[in-house]
Amino acid sequence: MFITFEGPDGSGKSTIIQKVYDYLIENNYDVIKTREPGGSPIAEKIRNLILDTENIKMGYRTEALLYAASRAQHVEETILPALNENKIVLCDRFLISSLAYQGVGRGLGIENVRNINEFAINGVFPDFVLFFDVDPITTLKRKSSLDTADRLEKEGNNFHERVYNGYKEILNSEKNIEIIDATQSVEDVFSQCIEVLKRRNVL
């Protein structure tokens, strides 16, 4: 079972994926938690290149291709082997993030970004997606400081609004999306996720 956690920066998905992972471990499920960009030694090196705040001259196409390259390695080295061992895979970001951030946020076009990423993942799609729905104004308020923000997190409000609107556009055409109200408390959001996992027969 392959489950991805998607949402804008500051939506709380990284906190919740850890709680879901801990819950599954405590209940003796065979599960791994991973992230994008990154998730394997080579993919993590690509992550560092993408998010380094010194790489301000990185072109948008370069950025999109690096995300796809990281994803290809991540699938081959981490995700697919785990799925072949019948493990539950929880992944913090996947394909839809690239469609929203590079396809819409960077203006490269959803279909252009989809094409390079579908080549990268080679047919390995999530069984379903948990989308953490919260508007960009709220997410920006949640960030205590930009001092530790990465290159994309440092983008202005207009960029993050485009990304959020991109997510909304993409969700209308994608299947197997579960909308999580991420404006609620951590415990309430966690409970929503557990209910989805039960309904989806993961638990």
UniProtKB/Swiss-Prot annotation:
GO cellular component, one term: cytosol
Family annotation (InterPro entries): P-loop_NTPase (IPR027417), Thymidylate_kin-like_dom (IPR039430), Thymidylate_kin_CS (IPR018095), Thymidylate_kinase (IPR018094)
Gene Ontology MF annotations: ATP binding; dTMP kinase activity
Catalytic activity: dTMP + ATP = dTDP + ADP
Keywords, ordered alphabetically: ATP-binding, Kinase, Nucleotide biosynthesis, Nucleotide-binding, Transferase
Binding site for ATP: G7, P8, D9, G10, S11, G12, K13, S14
Biological-process GO terms, alphabetical: dTDP biosynthetic process; dTTP biosynthetic process; dUDP biosynthetic process
EC number(s) from the headed UniProt entry: 2.7.4.9
Pfam families: Thymidylate_kin (PF02223)
Disulfide bridge positions per record: none
Class in the EC hierarchy, top level: transferase
Function: Phosphorylation of dTMP to form dTDP in both de novo and salvage pathways of dTTP synthesis.
PANTHER family with a match to the protein in the record: THYMIDYLATE KINASE, UMP-CMP KINASE 2, MITOCHONDRIAL
Family: Belongs to the thymidylate kinase family.
Family matches, as HAMAP family: Thymidylate_kinase
Name of protein: Thymidylate kinase
